[in-house]
Amino acid sequence: MLSTQWNANKQISRQIYQLCRGLAQKATAVNLEEAKPYADIPGPSKLQLIRAFLPGGLYKNLPVHEMFLDMNRQYGSIFRMPSVAGTDLVLTMNPQDYEVIFRNEGQYPYRRSFEVMDYFKRVHRREVFDGYDGLTSGNGPAWGKMRTAVNPILLQPRNAKLYMTNLVQVSDEFLERIRIIRDPVTQEMPDDFAVDIRHLVIESICSVALNTHLGLLGEQRNNKDIQKLVLALQDVVELGFQLDIMPAFWKYLPMPNFKKLMRSLDTITDFCYFHIGNALKRIEEDAKAGTLNEIGLETSLLEKLARFDRQTAVIIAMDLLFAGADPTLVTLGGILFSLSKSPDKQARLLEEIRGILPNKDSSLTIENMRNLPYLRACIKEGIRMYPIGPGTLRRMPHDVVLSGYRVVAGTDVGIAANYQMANMEQFVPKVREFIPERWLRDESNSHLVGETATPFMYLPFGFGPRSCAGKRIVDMMLEIAISRLVRNFKIGFDYPIENAFKAQFFVQPNIPFKFKFIERNE
């Protein structure tokens, strides 16, 4: 079953090579015996690092990418962060190391999991998860088995028909929400419009993973139980960063934030378990009545997942919520900011969308969305300019040479490619300009590619068997939302966007999302 995903990754790699035509360079081959020893990798001492994270320390309230940049200035393109309790972390900002890391990740690429999440699943709620780790936090053969099982469900294009209708319905509700809350004079959204975008994303994910309509964009917007879920998802992002990315003091000291995070994870787990339990009951009733759809003829993604077992369905739903809610908010917000400040790009996108949506209320279908190259280029450029995090992590299964140093097996290695692609001119010319054309298959765009870029720098959904399992769902969600918004409204924003987001480990909104949505004529 993994062959489908490998083929998809080959296609992605070919597209990236097209973007970086001829510019990729092989990492310099250095014999392990000739490499400088691991102990010589520069970096702060354990005591220096602890002090830096304490109140008054240099890194106490510093965004992660700025911390990495400070260490980059002090120690060079590769440096080591010693662990307070656990595994060291080696950070490299040398693009020539990235291929070495990905090509040596092994059969079951190991990514350091969130230890608080491991504790929650293996200790706090052991009776629910029963040894299941999931796609985002799991590793090893158990992860590989689950990934192989769900790949055909989540990644096959033909399964998009199972959730297309739900996503279109949610998008239409979002348009109506905009018309209700915008100022009738200025056409602006209220200061807290980011909350509505977050609700759009959560509603969309639940419509796919749980086959459930929450009503977040309408009648159930202020429902206490649903708001509890929304707040719990925010806690997971904020508290997970504080407790897991920073030194893990929670292992040794009673910390209120740790208890709060456990309560928030309980809320999300119970919510998913309840709705999946209802779905399983419906499936059992259909089976007794003889009306259960045959395998391959299911009418929802949840129905397919539920054929495995309750734990699998719960874990996939939770993973989609954890990995999709805030990141997709940032991505969609970033694309809207970019389009609002680039009226020429917005006009070109509108022209393309009019080709499939001649009227504002024309229907979106799988068929008419197949050929939208400029829309997809806008999404890629938005993801490049507004990445959700600095990069990714891998644990090396055997010794490798990175930047001339021997990195020993079992070491966690991080890369900062996302930050580099968003901010560094040597990798992307006109780096802070929104230029979707750089992603089109046009030989005249070669000047929009940095001379030192490599094919392994733009991988926002990951690489290989560990690439994001929810990529197709997120792509479709964005394509539907942006198509409907641009077709119905002229999008504007009358304020600076230089500091639109703030970065901790994941990025969060930093300014009021006071977009203008001006109704278009037919």
Swiss-Prot record:
One of its GO terms (molecular function) is monooxygenase activity. It is found in: Mitochondrion membrane. It is an enzyme of class 1 (oxidoreductase). Its cofactor is heme. GO terms for cellular component: mitochondrial membrane. Transmembrane segments: none annotated. Gene3D superfamilies: Cytochrome P450 (1.10.630.10). Keywords: Heme, Iron, Membrane, Metal-binding, Mitochondrion, Monooxygenase, Oxidoreductase, Transit peptide. InterPro entries: CYP11_CYP27_families (IPR050479), Cyt_P450 (IPR001128), Cyt_P450_CS (IPR017972), Cyt_P450_E_grp-I (IPR002401), Cyt_P450_sf (IPR036396). PROSITE patterns: CYTOCHROME_P450. Heme binds at residue 468. PANTHER family: CYTOCHROME P450. Belongs to the cytochrome P450 family. This is Probable cytochrome P450 12e1, mitochondrial. It comes from Drosophila melanogaster (Fruit fly).
